[in-house]
């Protein structure tokens, strides 16, 4: 995950009142963007997610490019299409790369289950 062009920022712990698997599902689900992150990462008037593929390989589970129209994907206040690539490395460890006109953003999530209904997230 090392890239000299990235600025590394460690975040967490974040305590979730949800199972670790539910928290991971939310991290991987781009279809919620228009409803939960409306105005920034999604727009209810355009909830369409174009088809993409999911493959299993030696790295884990990976998606092809997921193209999404976002109202303000990088804080510059301009609507544009962005591209996400997701990887699931282990059952509770995943990452995505988001490519915008302003550059590239990478996020890594590792979840620690505390109980059936609580977990801790690290980014």
Residue ranges and their predicted role:
Residues 1-123:
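C-terminal catalytic domain of Rieske-type non-heme iron oxygenases
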């Amino acid at each position: 995950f090392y890239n000299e062009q990235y600025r590394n920022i460690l975040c967490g712990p974040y305590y979730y009142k949800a199972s670790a698997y539910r928290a991971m599902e939310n991290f991987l689900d781009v279809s919620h963007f228009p409803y939960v992150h409306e105005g920034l990462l999604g727009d209810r008037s355009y909830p369409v997610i174009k088809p993409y593929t999911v493959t299993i390989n030696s790295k884990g589970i990976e998606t092809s490019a997921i193209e999404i129209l976002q109202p303000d994907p990088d804080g510059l206040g301009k609507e544009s299409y962005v591209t996400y690539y997701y990887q699931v490395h282990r059952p509770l460890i995943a990452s995505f790369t988001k490519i915008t006109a302003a550059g590239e953003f990478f996020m890594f999530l590792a979840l620690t289950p505390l109980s059936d209904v609580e977990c801790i997230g690290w980014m």
